[in-house]
Amino acid sequence: SVGAGGLFMFFVVYGISVSALFSVPKNKIPYMILFSQLVDIIFMSVVFFRNKPIGEGYGKFFSVISSRWTFLITSFGIPFILSLLLFPEYIVVLFSVIIIAIILRLYLYKIFGGVNGDIVGASGEIGRMFALLLSTISIFLV
């Protein structure tokens, strides 16, 4: 079951994401979706790297994998390099979202002492939202 907080997050995150997509020229939408997906992967990998699992589930299983440097290279490095190569105009957005991910990670670890799969998934959606929002702002500033 989903609580009121989950429903609130759904409407806020997806409301902002859809608003950002409808605010840009139509020819930019596919690129923004691809960029936000790459940022989503980067965001989740920052939050999940060297995870201290809370509770049981897949998060505990994957925490063993996330403690390896190969995890960071494949889940952070590859999307990061692709983002820089495909979307050099969004470099400020990319670094801004990485800073937001680091801040969120520190906050989550302070509050919960670790993360589980639900928290990682929600953080990915938050990262996607910030990527779309900041990309939209950068389009109008350029």
Q: What is the meaning of each model-derived region?
A:
Residues 1-26, 69-83, 125-131, 135-142:
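Multi-pass membrane catalytic core of lipid/isoprenoid biosynthesis enzymes
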